[in-house]
Structure formats: C-alpha cells, structure tokens
Amino acid sequence: GIALVSTVMNFQTIRFADNNDLPLVLILPSYTATAWYHKKLPPAMQSKSIAQVVDEGRKFAANEYAPAMLRIDSLSPAERNTLAERYSSLTGLSKDFVERNNFRVDLGEFNKELLRSERRTTGRLDSRFKGIDRDAAGDGPDSDPSMNAIRPPYTAAFNSYVRGDLGFKSDVEYYILGGGITTPWNWNTNNAYADTSIPLKDAMAKNPYMKIFLAQGYYDMATPFYAAEYTVSAMNLDPSLRRNITFDYYEAGHMMYIDTKSLAKLKRDATAFIQNAVARAER
C-alpha cells in the first residue's frame, strides 16, 4: 500500500493563477476551518465542531461557489449579493473584501486579511499560527509564521542527531526544504500541471489489492484536504477500487505530527491501515 501524508497529486488544484479558478474552490473549506479556529465565524457556525464546519464549507464550495464561478461575470446583482454573503459567513472575510476581489481570494490575500484588524497574519503550512508583518497594509504576508516556528527546531534537532548521535560530518550543504531538493525534480510533464494521480490510477488498476491511505490536516493551506478529496474523486476509478482508499483528518496543519494529539491519532490511523491491508491480503 501507499501512505500519502499532506498530499498534492494534481498541482492544478493548488496553483493560484489568473486562468485557474479551481484552487479557489478547493481551498475554501480550509478557509472555513481557519476562520473557525480563530473565532471569526458567526456564532451559529462557531458552535459547531470542526468536522461540521468544514462540511458546510465543502457543500458551499461544491454546490454554490463552483457553479457561480463558471459564470461569475454574468451573475445578476442579487445573485452576487447572495454569493458574497454566503462566502463571507463561511470565511470570516468581509462581504466588501470578497466582492472587491471578484470572489477570487487567493491564499496570500486570505492569510493577510483574516486577522488584519488584529495586525496579524495566518500561516500557510499551519493556519493556526499567527504572524506579525512589518506593516498591516500589504496584500499578502511577509512570510509564513508556521514555517518560521517549525523550521528552526527541526533543523537544530536533525543537526544534533546526525552530528552528535550518529557522528556523521560532511561539508555538503543539507537542504531542509526547497533549494537543492526541488530544483532538479522532473515531473515528466510538458506545458501541463504535474499530476501523479494518473500513474497512481494506473498502478491501482494493475494491482487491485493495493491500498491507499491519505492523512490530511484541516489547517494545512499548502496542500488543502478538499483538493486531495477532489483529486481522488476525479481519478475515474472502477467502483471496486474506491474502497481501497482511506482518508483520515487531523486538527492540525501540513505537519500534523507537531501536534501531540494529532501525532497519536496519526499513529493509530496508520497502524489500523496497515493491519487492515495485511488482514485482507491474508484472506
């Protein structure tokens, strides 16, 4: 089987661009989760659980927002007003801000705007984190506060482990993220978005016993959970193969294992996935 943690397979689902509205729809439930966490939703929504809240976001994204974006410039004034009110109530953003952005609020704009009145920003890897920018008037955050908080201790811990515990030394630069890691990647795509769901579908068809486990954080804005759900639902799998896919969700971000409760849940979920896969294989 395969375990996918905080995954993106189809990069069209997360690349904000002038000619690509899909990420706007697929990240909306994550906006809802983030607004709920920071207590920016109406009282009726704040009283719901995180699972209930994101389900409201899913329904709006699929049944109202996505159809509206197909004809956004031809909506009547009344339709635009209704859409703006619903969008605002599910994201914590003002109706005026949503309308001024023509309903296209990308991640940077959301991270800057949600807590602007508090002169704070929200994180990309984990939207529970708050950041402080040089000024509160920009269009996007200066940096990712969750990355700023997570990266230094992980770097220090790994350096201590490799040099201290293992006694390994090298003058070769070690990349924590990006740089020398991502630059040479070959996605085997030309003039198209990278999409690994296609080879995954082929692999599942060739091996119908293969199981897939997807672990997604509600507050992960880098690889939103609804984008992963959409990708899986669009793989055009045979019905007999769909039952081989398991989703589990965590009240954390991209690196859900930094949260103690989510780490324990991830271990339980992964253990159950492996045990279930082995049990089926032995039948």
Language-model features: where?
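A catalytic-pocket lid/entrance helix-loop region that shapes and gates access to the active site
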Residues: 1-92
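Short glycine-rich catalytic loops that host catalytic nucleophiles or stabilize transition states
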Residues: 4, 247-253
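Short, solvent-exposed loop/turn segments at secondary-structure junctions
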Residues: 9-10, 219-221, 253-255
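A short acidic (Asp/Glu
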Residues: 14-16, 223-227, 258-260
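Active-site-adjacent alpha-helix of alpha/beta-hydrolase-fold enzymes
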Residues: 26-29, 221-244
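Alpha/beta-hydrolase fold catalytic core
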Residues: 69-222
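Catalytic histidine-centered segment of alpha/beta-hydrolase-like enzymes
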Residues: 251-263
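C-terminal alpha-helix
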Residues: 269-280
